[in-house]
Amino acid sequence: MGMTITEKILAEHAGKKEVHPGELITAKIDLAMANDVTAPLAIKILEKYGIDKVFDPERIALVLSHFVPAKDIKSAEQAKIVREFVKKHGIKWFFEEGEGIEHAILPEQGLVVPGDLVVGADSHTCTYGALGAFATGVGSTDIAYAMATGEVWLRVPESMKFIFYGKLKPWVMGKDLILYTIGQIGVDGALYRAMEFDGETIRNLSMEQRFTIANMAIEAGGKSGIISPDEKTIEYVKQRAKRPWKVYQSDPDAEYHSVYEWDASQIEPLVAWPYLPSNVHPVSESTHITIDQAFIGSCTNGRIEDLRVAAKVFEAALKQGKKVHPYVRCIVIPASKAIYKQALKEGLIDIFMEAGCVVSTSTCGPCLGGHMGVLAEGERCISTSNRNFPGRMGHPKSESYLANPAVVAASAIMGRIAHPDEVVKAETLAGV
């Protein structure tokens, strides 16, 4: 029996010829990552046990991303702990506040390549699976162990395969494909399983949209999300990689827990209503819902393609004399400094600001209800982020709706959840 791409990567890193689902292994890692929320806990664990040396300062990445710029004294002290650890151990890959969100930075910097085994003290570490790597989130104790030893202990997951075929409708993006997937299988439908995505539709997606899909694998309970490398992957990696890579593909006779196959041409832009990412509805069934805030950003949809799509909608509105609805505040946060600079170069930031958006430095910010866009009681936000649990973006009685950047931009203009065609087609009809 053949192996899946996930099993091949894990076998290689465990020093075995093959591994099987359910098998417990100790595997060598290529990179350990933590942020300003999770790294201080790991650092305290290392100090508690008197561990004063990391396994390799060039194989650890620490990113200040969640509560930056520091929102209060506690978050400032958290960041200070990380900075002092970086200086003490000579950590090479340290990213200060404003550099961006880890799940945008690490691929940009070429710190994750195909065939890698990456562990990160953040649940959305699965994002890197878009590069054909096995990447998974772990707790601060596990990341402390990984930083000390260069190893991780885990159970080999079963794999599930999701095949999409057909041409996407206008305004349908990778975000809609992953929302559709979660809507079909539920938030525990892939519990501790590797979610492998394939099919002509996936192959036609940009790397940015593939990152979005892998990013939200955890929202279905997935241990990881992964897409086998192809020409697009290699082209992306060639320009960035800091070290050699190895391409793995699933064997034709690999065994899967289950295989799903869907016609993507039948999917329209979707919205996940509160309070689960699986509570998915078409935009056409959501247009009665008014909003107070719109957020475009996060590690899910804060990349340059996302900003371009949103800017297209805002630009169409501006040509009609429309801006962000007077009762709505719209926050745009590029996922990294590099993305911010590119957006400036392309004139996207000018469009956002002219349309009435607030544009901020790269940070996780409102996604986790941290700061820079926290919701009050009873407020509603439509967001390009990845979670909409009670209190996720602020008050426990606030509501978060998840959608792609085009839908969020259109909603910001209309003051309610809206299909992008309501703005962009209106421009065409008006002859503007």
From Swiss-Prot:
Entry EC number(s): 4.2.1.33
Family membership noted in the UniProt record: Belongs to the aconitase/IPM isomerase family. LeuC type 2 subfamily.
Alphabetically ordered keywords of this record: 4Fe-4S, Amino-acid biosynthesis, Branched-chain amino acid biosynthesis, Iron, Iron-sulfur, Leucine biosynthesis, Lyase, Metal-binding
Coiled coil: none
UniProt subunit comment: Heterodimer of LeuC and LeuD.
EC class: lyase
Pathway linked to the protein: Amino-acid biosynthesis; L-leucine biosynthesis; L-leucine from 3-methyl-2-oxobutanoate: step 2/4
Cofactor(s) needed by this chain: [4Fe-4S] cluster
Listed GO biological process terms: L-leucine biosynthetic process
Domain of life: Bacteria
Pfam families (UniProt xref): Aconitase
Reactions that this protein is recorded to catalyse: (2R,3S)-3-isopropylmalate = (2S)-2-isopropylmalate
Residues annotated as binding [4Fe-4S] cluster: 299, 364, 367
Name of the protein: 3-isopropylmalate dehydratase large subunit
PROSITE patterns: ACONITASE_1, ACONITASE_2
Gene from which this protein is expressed: leuC
Disulfide-bonded cysteines: none
SUPFAM superfamilies in the cross-refs: Aconitase iron-sulfur domain
Function: Catalyzes the isomerization between 2-isopropylmalate and 3-isopropylmalate, via the formation of 2-isopropylmaleate.
GO molecular function term, any single one: metal ion binding
PANTHER family, A to Z: 3-ISOPROPYLMALATE DEHYDRATASE LARGE SUBUNIT 2, HOMOACONITASE, MITOCHONDRIAL-RELATED
InterPro entries tied to this protein: Acnase/IPM_dHydase_lsu_aba_1/3, Acoase/IPM_deHydtase_lsu_aba, Aconitase_4Fe-4S_BS, Aconitase_4Fe-4S_dom, HAcnase/IPMdehydase_lsu_prok, Homoacnase/IPMdehydase_lsu, IPM_dehydratase_rel_enz, IPMI_cat
Cofactor-binding details, from the entry: Binds 1 [4Fe-4S] cluster per subunit.
